[in-house]
């Protein structure tokens, strides 16, 4: 991505909203906002760093999930994250973008980490903006970084749900694909939970290095 492109303001009024199929998942339509005169387009993504509730926050102690069926020792872990689909972003054209992002990240956390109750969920103000290799020059994506807290009881319940699913493989098979993308949950460790993909390592460096959150 060109170095001189600032973080584009996806919260400003007057942006067009739409959805488009992308090459990596052509069976889905992904939500975007587009500037009516400048022409840039941003696909919206969200990532959530979940800490244990009721104890002092340690920036390097957050929950990560493992890619379904992968070797736990491989680069197969990441914080819960995902990209907003058109069916979610276009339901109400007047719904604020921040609210859409909050709903999106809660949905991703429930699908990937089996966590249903997040306390004090908030947008950290951190945004990772970049481009995929097949994007046109004026198309971008943004990861909006959220922070939340989870009780030990909710973490234990989610872990039990993963255990039950491992013990009942036919139940896994019956689940929608987007609900079985991940199959384990644990605390981040720089040596034991190696990060997958292009963007998870950058998101972690951004989050852990920012002193304002």
Segments (PLM) and residue ranges:
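Short hydrophobic/aromatic beta-strand or adjacent loop that forms the aromatic wall/cage
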Residues: 43-47, 140-145
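Nudix hydrolase/Nudix homology domain
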Residues: 72-76, 80-82, 86-87, 139, ...
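Acidic, metal-coordinating catalytic segment for phosphate/diphosphate chemistry
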Residues: 2-56, 70
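Conserved beta-strand and immediately adjacent loop positions that scaffold enzyme active sites
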Residues: 47, 61, 184
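Conserved Nudix-box catalytic region and its N-terminal flanking loop in Nudix hydrolases
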Residues: 57-111, 115
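A short coil-to-beta-strand element that immediately follows conserved catalytic motifs
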Residues: 116-127
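Short, P/G- and charge-enriched loop/turn segments at secondary-structure junctions
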Residues: 30-39, 132-135, 170-175
């Amino acid at each position: 991505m060109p170095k001189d492109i600032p973080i584009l303001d996806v919260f400003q009024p007057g942006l067009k909203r739409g959805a488009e199929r992308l090459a990596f998942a052509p069976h889905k339509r992904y939500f975007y906002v587009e500037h009516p005169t400048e022409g840039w387009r941003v696909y919206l993504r969200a990532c959530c760093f979940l800490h244990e509730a009721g104890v002092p926050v340690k920036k390097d102690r957050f929950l990560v999930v493992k890619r379904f069926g992968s070797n736990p020792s491989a680069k197969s872990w990441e914080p819960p994250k995902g990209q907003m689909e058109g069916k979610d972003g276009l339901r109400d054209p007047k719904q604020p973008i921040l609210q859409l992002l909050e709903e999106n990240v809660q949905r991703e956390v429930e699908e990937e980490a089996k966590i249903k109750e997040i306390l004090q969920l908030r947008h950290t103000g951190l945004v990772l903006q970049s481009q995929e290799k097949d994007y046109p020059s004026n198309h971008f994506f943004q990861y909006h970084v959220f922070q939340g807290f989870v009780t030990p009881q909710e973490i234990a319940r989610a872990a039990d749900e993963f255990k039950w699913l491992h013990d009942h493989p036919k139940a896994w098979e019956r689940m929608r694909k987007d609900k079985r993308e991940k199959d384990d949950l644990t605390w981040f460790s720089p040596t034991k939970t190696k990060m997958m993909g292009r963007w998870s390592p950058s998101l972690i460096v951004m989050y852990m290095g920012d002193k304002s959150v």
